[in-house]
């Protein structure tokens, strides 16, 4: 069973909690209006609810919010105010406005009225199928999971409720391990609708008491679930909207479930169209339909043909190679190859076949750097004798954002590698290497001062295999 919240007027479940919270306000509070901070589905839910209830609504959004989202909120009747470079700054401004102007602040998840509104999905699920065994619910701030769990456990306690988190924003898992809500240092933004650094206090209390289990999934698994939904019902889900299905599939595989009646919540469909390219590319890996390999072969005539013969009838999905001017005649060639597979175990079989034929092979299927950047950069390697450090960056997309990044980066260190990629989401990705040694403390300090989310990738196997000297 699938509960389709993408069919809401704002294409997301968020209108339920916002409407319930705003409907419960007193006449005087309604007269004064409401305020919230959001750059996502909650913003549209509040704006639409205000229009339905005849209230004014101020939506504070970060200045880096894509114009398409600003326009969507304004089209629903919300008054948008842009403030700050991130959500925390926008929330602080919304809180200030609430106090200064006597407005009611509508929280995105950690509010009993919002939780109750989201919980109505649980009632409709039971009405849709009273014989369910398990329900899978996406978890961001926890409002949806808490609301659905409390209602189902009250009416049908035998139904198990499973929370599903993205592995790069698993704030509930962190809180369960720590015994209390914990602020994550970094969250991935692929599944933006659940990209929450810290679960709510009330939602954590309820989720800990009522959820039967929690499972985490990857971007690849989520992308595969987006495609599954399209194949089954011809709906295009946003990544966070497909999260519950990704969790359902993982849970079934890990626990060898069969014969049970399962349901998941398709929580939203506010997808940036250009993100589909990235999702389509990653869904093959998420479905275990593609293996990504780095293979060393002799740099000699006929070596490609011999390599292909080892693969046999298997379908090659990608083959990247470039002769480097710095390579000597005795240096081997390194190729980046994608191979279509029918099942997960076939990855190991392909690697074994290649190794038996005398090739050195690295399985890069689960290597994020390889899938996002390196596959587009196969070519020359670093200059011999020049030390190099590699960093990946995440920065908000907006007009001129790349130029601003380069200005902030400065010219103190020589850039030896650069790759920029946008997947249509609100954040862009950059891979950048500098001519610097591991003991260059000044470079590390400079990275910390930039103000961008970053990771050092110097030891990444895909980088070492294809691009490092």
Residue ranges and their predicted role:
Residues 1-401, 408-469:
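PLP-dependent amino-acid enzyme catalytic core
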């Amino acid at each position: 069973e699938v509960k389709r919240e993408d069919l809401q007027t704002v294409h997301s479940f968020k209108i339920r909690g916002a409407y319930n919270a705003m409907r419960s306000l007193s006449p005087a509070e309604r007269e004064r209006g409401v305020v919230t901070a959001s750059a996502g589905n909650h913003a549209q839910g509040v704006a639409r609810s205000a229009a339905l209830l005849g209230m004014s609504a101020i939506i504070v959004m970060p200045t880096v919010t894509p114009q398409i989202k600003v326009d969507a909120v304004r089209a629903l009747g919300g008054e948008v105010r842009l403030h700050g470079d991130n959500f925390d700054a926008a929330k602080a401004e919304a809180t200030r406005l609430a106090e200064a102007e006597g407005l009611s602040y509508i929280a995105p998840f950690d509010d009993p009225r919002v939780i109750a509104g989201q919980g109505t999905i649980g009632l409709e699920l039971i009405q849709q199928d009273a014989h369910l065994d398990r329900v899978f619910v996406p978890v961001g701030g926890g409002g949806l999971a808490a609301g659905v769990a409390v209602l189902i456990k009250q009416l049908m306690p035998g139904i198990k409720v499973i929370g599903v988190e993205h592995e790069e924003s698993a704030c509930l898992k962190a809180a369960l391990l720590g015994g209390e809500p914990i602020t994550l240092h970094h969250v991935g933004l692929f599944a933006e609708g659940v990209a929450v650094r810290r679960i709510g206090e009330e939602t954590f209390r309820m989720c800990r008491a009522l959820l039967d289990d929690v499972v985490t999934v990857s971007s690849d698994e989520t992308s595969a679930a987006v495609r599954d939904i399209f194949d089954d019902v011809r709906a295009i889900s946003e990544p966070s909207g497909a999260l519950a299905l990704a969790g359902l599939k993982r849970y079934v595989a890990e626990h060898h479930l069969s014969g049970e009646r399962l349901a998941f919540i398709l929580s939203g469909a506010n997808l940036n169209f250009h993100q589909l390219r990235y999702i389509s590319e990653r869904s093959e890996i998420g479905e275990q339909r593609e293996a990504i390999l780095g293979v060393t072969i002799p740099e000699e005539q006929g070596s490609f043909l011999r390599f292909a013969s080892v693969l046999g009838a298997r379908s090659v999905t990608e083959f990247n190679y470039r002769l480097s001017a710095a390579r000597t005649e005795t240096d081997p060639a390194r190729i980046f190859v994608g191979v279509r597979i029918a099942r997960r175990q076939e990855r190991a079989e392909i690697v074994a076949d290649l190794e038996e034929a005398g090739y050195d092979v690295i399985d890069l299927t689960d290597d994020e750097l390889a899938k996002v950047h390196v596959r587009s950069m196969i070519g020359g390697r670093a200059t011999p004798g020049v030390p190099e450090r590699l960093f990946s960056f995440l920065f908000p997309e907006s007009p001129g954002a790349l130029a601003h990044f380069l200005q902030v980066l400065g010219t103190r260190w020589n850039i030896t590698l650069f790759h920029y990629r946008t997947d249509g989401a609100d954040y862009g990705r950059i891979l950048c290497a500098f001519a610097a040694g591991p003991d260059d403390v000044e470079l590390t300090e400079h990275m910390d001062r930039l103000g961008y989310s970053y990771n050092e990738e110097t030891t990444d196997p895909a980088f070492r295999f294809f691009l490092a000297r």
